[in-house]
Amino acid sequence: MFSKKDIIVLGMMIFALFLGAGNIIFPPMEGYSAGNHWATASLGFVITGVLMPFITLVVVSVLGRGEELTKDLPKWAGVSFLTILYLVIGSTFAMPRITNVAYEMAWLPLGLVEDSSTTRLIFSVIFNIIAMGFMIRPTTVISTVGEVMTPALLVLLLVVGITVFVSPLSEIVAPSQAYAENSALTTGLISGYQTMDVLAAIAFGGIVARALSAKNVTNPQKIVQYTISAGFVSVILLGCLYFALFYLGATSDAVAQGATNGGQIFSRYVNSLFGTAGTWIMAGIITLASLTTLVGVTSACGDYFSKFSTRFSYPFWIVFFTAMTTIISQYGLTKLLRVTIPALLLIYPIAIMLVVLQLVRNKLPSVRLSYYVTIFVTVCFSLVDSLKNLDVLPEGVHQVMIHFPLYSQGLAWLVPALCTLVISILLGKTISK
């Protein structure tokens, strides 16, 4: 029996898994830029940054595993996509970045040690071994994250959130940057899209499905019911958090001058509110947020790769990916960000369209036709966005692409992909007659 307590614990686990350190440091800059339009901007941010991943989570939980999204593609294409996805969000890019965020934004500001390659290595080893201890057995992930880490993280965030609304640092100023020129809702939508949490939802859907299975919940209708209930808990928590972080950014003019990212704004704000204690609060929030995401993502990666061979079990992959994360994290945060974003720009649109295709799959007259052509077009246009980010896109292609809607926002793929899907449906109906 799945009790109300189980739903709340599962919902808190989902919340913590999605709440990486990046999700905490990104909204304050958006709130600062949105100014007195912060509330509208935060609504747009929540739609694409919270609701889209929530829908993906429900879809994947019903399917049972993220790889079921690719079942209508050629096997090589599905395996290639999922391998790239798990490596990008896992130990090749995102998890080393998470380790570096914890080191540079939580550990170093405490002033306990000097920054050096040796210090970074020691921190990375200890941090990742602690995470590995929580996930070496897959059955402990939900209890560890949902019952232990999340409550501690929520307490710290609640203290900051309440204080921000009770004692804001500054008056809210006029919007700037993209928010001064465009609709706050639209800009917020694009900003929420850039969290790219749909990728994480594909990985975490399997964790939710296994958590439900452990409670003997296998009926598809019950899976949908409980996933929506638990997911709703996480949606409320994430929505409230983003709302508070946008307000923090909007009222940060006194400390935001010269800040280059939301992490700096968040850190300065917390330090201004709490003094020396603020540094420790910041360290606690970033450490717990980083740890929960590291545990969830690496666990999902280990589960996926363990299916390829009985010789290499889940514990083997956890140890392997932990070692890989530790080694790659020595390259530093700046270098990792430089290669992470182009990789994400390449696979994120594919992930979104796979979810869209799954949602309408039963209505497609020719499933294979729609999947093949829609994903092919999505790959082509997402490759353009990726090459543009690397500054290696040929000038001739750039001159053509500037005429496409949303190209400047990194969303050149969206309209062509949706149009291709519609055309494939019409063609499928014609062929089936």
Locate predicted features.
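Membrane-interface loop-to-helix entry segments
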Residues: 134-164, 340-352, 371-379
